[in-house]
Amino acid sequence: MLFNSIDFAIFLPVVFFLYWFVVNKNLQLQNFLLLVASYVFYGWWDWRFLSLIAFSTLVDYSLGVLLGKEEKESKRKVYLWTSIIVNLGFLGFFKYYNFFVESFVDAFTFFGQEIEIGTLNIILPVGISFYTFQTLSYTIDVYKRNLEPTKKFIAFAAFVSFFPQLVAGPIERASNLLPQILKKRSFNYCEAKDGLRLMLWGLFKKVVIADSLSPIVNDIFSNYSTLSSPVLIMGAIFFAFQIYGDFSGYSDIAIGTAKLFGIELMSNFKFPYFSKNIGEFWRRWHISLSTWFRDYLYIPLGGSRGSKLKGIRNVFAIFIVSGFWHGANWTFIFWGLFHALLFLPSFILGTNRKYVEIAKSGFNIVTAIKNVYRTVLTFALVTVGWVFFRAETISDAFTYLKRIVTVFSVGDYSHPNGYRLIDYLLLLLFFVAYEYIIRNKERNPISFKNKYVRLLVYILLVFLMLLFYDDGVDRSFIYFQF
């Protein structure tokens, strides 16, 4: 079920009404309703995969209880590794089996040996990478004794499958979400209003930014071999904003929807394209994933402690695994490697957080000019990375970038929908300018004290959504494939 669908527009008010007006006196019934609603929401895509999430829930709930009772460290490790193997085993089979088989065959072919290993027709369960990491964080935290295991199965199952963030995040920690599900909740009018505003802002980013750019991005990346440098540059920039509008829009809708049920999810984006270096970008982009890898991979590997060589190893590990998490394709692995290489200089020189401190020290014209330069440079480098993320193969990505620096002819490009590149550029300039104005309001981007300003913003956003809505565009979210 898509957030931007008629189905969800009917589903959400029904669940909201039942939650606050029918079962509001009983916490257990509220949690049971959330669980049922979440399974209906997830089963809307393919009901067969409900058994997968149910099994994962049952396994990690049981192992959490066992970890809470067991004092012997050797047995506790067995329980932890059982959780890791089961969860990553499912993820590996459904998401990476064919990739490993094809890569294995290609490796033998490269060395002149022909072998035949059949691939399987595997359907990737929606959101498996997200809920796998969410439930894994629970068993890891219980193992580390950072979290008390819950004995309330319905509440735990609702935590794993909470529908607003189930299929594309934010990837919640049990330490944040589970206590909220376990405690009594009361309706908060102000929070609900904030939630609706966030949902409106997220829908605007999805419909007006992401969906309107989607056809032209698809067209440019499909026909890049015939296009000139200016058009290819625009294609890369447009994809940068498409994926940002798509993914951050989903996160805004998810966070806003959760607010309607009295639950606060973590921020997932903090205006990442205003970052002044790659380290800052990753503190602002997909925060729930980057902090997950930091806490459960980077720090256990040693983080920045120890020798520089080990620190560099850990940096490469976290970025490459992050790339691989996104998809079973060498393009994603290369994208992760590319970001590791971009991050490495500031890591080695110890300047990762330098510009954050400079920004806090007050306004200075020279510093401001330097920060603009750093922001533009960081965005340009991130956009180069997005070419690898979007391309079908690494070879396609390199050819795309090669044409940018070698084919300089200027031609008028117009997409069949009637809009010109300049129309999209003006749209993005408006969007960037507005985001800059609200950059300190990431939890409430369209809330203004003046009610007339608020009303004007609401009307403008709805008008633009109606103007740019295209029924022929694929309305699914990009990160559903991950």
What name fits each language-model region?
Residues 1-431, 436-481:
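Membrane-embedded transmembrane alpha-helical bundles that form the catalytic cores
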